[in-house]
């Protein structure tokens, strides 16, 4: 494997991880199970969606 191929693979892997980190919490109205999944820190226990702050 060439150096360019290795750098390309590392760049693609890094880009995929950036998207995961940016989407680490769910926005208001998203489906959730636990409160720590929501950006607001509040998950409705009855309807299983993220509540606003």
Curated annotation (Swiss-Prot):
Q: Does the keyword tRNA processing apply?
A: no
Q: Where is the signal peptide?
A: 1-18
The UniProt entry's GO CC annotations, sorted and at most eight, read:
extracellular region
- Kindly list the places in or outside the cell where this protein is found, as annotated in its UniProt entry: Secreted
Recorded hits in InterPro entries, A to Z, give: Toxin_18 (IPR012623)
Instruction: Print the keywords alphabetically.
Output: Disulfide bond, Knottin, Secreted, Signal
| Cysteine-cysteine disulfides | 25-39, 32-43, 38-50
* Domain description: The presence of a 'disulfide through disulfide knot' structurally defines this protein as a knottin.
Protein name in the entry: Conotoxin-like peptide 1
Q: Which organism is it from?
A: Orgyia pseudotsugata multicapsid polyhedrosis virus
């Amino acid at each position: 494997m060439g150096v360019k191929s290795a750098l390309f693979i590392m760049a693609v892997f890094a880009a995929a991880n950036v998207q995961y980190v940016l989407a680490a919490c769910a926005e208001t109205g998203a489906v959730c199970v636990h409160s720590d999944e929501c950006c607001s820190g509040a998950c409705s226990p009855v309807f299983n969606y993220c509540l606003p702050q």
